[in-house]
Amino acid sequence: MLIEFSVTNFKSIRERQTLSMVASNYYKELVDENTFEVESEESFPRLLKSAVIYGPNASGKSTLVEAMEFVDNFVCTSSNESQAGDRVGVVPFRLSAETRNGDSQFDVAFFEEGVRYEFGFCANSERVTAEWLYAYPKGRAQRMYTRYYNDDADSYHYVWGKNFLGGRRRTDWKNSTRPNALFLSTAVQLNCEQLQSPFNWFKSRIATLDPSILSASYTMKHFEERKSAILEFLSAADLFIADIKIDKIKFDPALVPSDMPPGLKEEVIKNMSGKEFAEAKFYLKSVDDGELIEFADDEISAGTKALFNFSGPWIDVVSRSRVLFVDELDSSLHPLVVHQLIRILHNAGKPVQMVFTTHDTSILGHKGILRRDQVWMIEKSDQQASILTPLSDYSVRDDEALEKGYLGGRYGGIPFVKDLTIGN
């Protein structure tokens, strides 16, 4: 599970910004509901099940989610889905000459299979310039490896920890690691069993979602195996969907627009011929006799479709103890539905975490949804760099109206809206 995530010099983030999922011992509310104890042989504080990030438009809320998505993809694919010479997908803070030409840095602390790990790397568009991994079995620090690029020598220097096994194979892993790839990714691809556990945390635990662009493909692909859970999920959101069926539809050349250029039309038909597409059909009960009435996709509201699209990934996250990063959780969803989603996660009965951004301040106004150490604010500095601040940095009273305080500007993270007069 996620302990801490830090980002330096990435997009709107200039100085190091850290999101911590460690629960504060100071707050006594919702301990059983919103925090959990890590199964580990070391004594470690409880972790939070969720964290919310508030901030105005263009403040950098999405940047943190994008940073984790980049790290996750880079760990999982840098060794096998890129070629020598491909650019690394980092984007530095561009409003300063110093950072514009500097490296981006990412640090992740997490638990996997009862062991704490600290993994991180620095990179620019051309190469990884540093990489490190430490393990803490029973709380004792063990270096697995460190990797640094020596610019003067144009070569990499590796230091192996005494507990990092592999013998001569470590040299093979090192020599096979391209400048634009991670050693962690490469070594696992070459069957390094000792690094499989931390690699699997990124591969199997981390998930990032943007509900505004989430399609129904994942939910439909896994629909039959999770049908009852999906219907229960939609019912919990107070949607009166009695049944859903997924039909397979073969591609029909007649659907290709007639005004499409002949050459392009021929290519489309050639590429799509014989392919099948999934289509969801929704059924509601008749108010007269309970008969199931079919509704086509275009007859279903955008909110219902958004929840259906979201249900598959959401159930996957909750059932598999994953760590979910969601950008704009409230997109197309009613505030009360958002509240219910958070409660479902908190009551999952197993370790599961979510970090999400939102503009929905009603979450702050409802007691029993979030603890004060689960709330974060992000805003731009005078240098237009994103600054992430926990609500716990402010002197917040037990009985303080958080929504009112936030909207009143007490904690930052709100837009400064100027008066605007439109001329005739």
Predicted regions and their residues:
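Electropositive, glycine-dotted interaction segments
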Residues: E118-V256
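An exposure/low-complexity boundary signal
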Residues: G60-G102, N175-L234, R343-A348, V352-Q353, ...
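Short acidic/polar mixed-charge low-complexity motifs
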Residues: I13-E15, E113-Y117, R127, G139-A141, ...
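Switch/communication elements of ASCE P-loop NTPase nucleotide-binding domains
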Residues: M1-E42, R46-V75, V287-V417
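Conserved P-loop NTP-binding catalytic core
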Residues: T35-V52, P56, V65-F119, N124-V128
